[in-house]
């Protein structure tokens, strides 16, 4: 069966990084292929005996984007193993990346009005509007806090895991950096006792045994984990029936170092029977409170 990966998302969110990783992993990759050629390209790839292809799609042809859901349906009807990944990032992060690269946004001309040139923020806002229908199609990865190496690792894990009906991901995050855009379910554990205020535990993370032992000693912590566990087990079958391929459960505390990391590790242990299961920790910085 031909494996097809479509990479789409906001310009500057890391599509080129993702495509290079796939190319290094043995995929035949095409960047910025016009959407009207996608079905034909996949058919030819299949006829030529290719096993893995990846295509990056952006908004250079915005008029075609409305057809992407139909194209995705057609590709699946062809019997391909299809994965669609949508990359996103905060507007501030995108603006910073454009400033560092000094690249021109692909929608600059389209967003401009008359003689007034559009600002970068205007271009990003227009692109979000154009891509909004696609964002809910498949798996979303928020690259705001990710290094290129982390993004490559996340894409590799996702592609390796994307063989089952539903990929379950648990990730911890820091509220001080904002709720990740790729979260389907969000649980706030800032109400739990905070190991940060114990000087011996402050430099550690929720993956370290002393922190785990400290948090495990509080009944309220165990009740919180039990409640999250029960909610997910109650509704996971329904998410699967909804033809969803991915479910990302995000758990946040103030700094993303102690409480959220511990809760995610405990949830991952409890759901270890689910295959595939991914665990991600967005922030584990020893100098920031959790």
UniProtKB/Swiss-Prot annotation:
**UniProt-listed Pfam families:** PapZ_C, RapZ-like_N
Give the record's keywords alphabetically. Answer: ATP-binding, GTP-binding, Nucleotide-binding
HAMAP family, per database record: RapZ_like
Binding residues for GTP:
58-61
GO molecular function ontology, one term from the record: ATP binding
Q: Which positions in this protein are listed as binding ATP?
A: 9-16
Q: Which family does it belong to?
A: Belongs to the RapZ-like family.
InterPro entries, per this entry? P-loop_NTPase (IPR027417), RapZ-like (IPR005337), RapZ-like_N (IPR053930), RapZ_C (IPR053931)
Q: What is the name of the protein in this document?
A: Nucleotide-binding protein BAV3158
Report if keyword ATP-binding is assigned. yes
PANTHER family associated with the record: RNASE ADAPTER PROTEIN RAPZ
Q: Which organism is it from?
A: Bordetella avium (strain 197N)
Q: Which domain of life is it from?
A: Bacteria
| Biological function | Displays ATPase and GTPase activities.
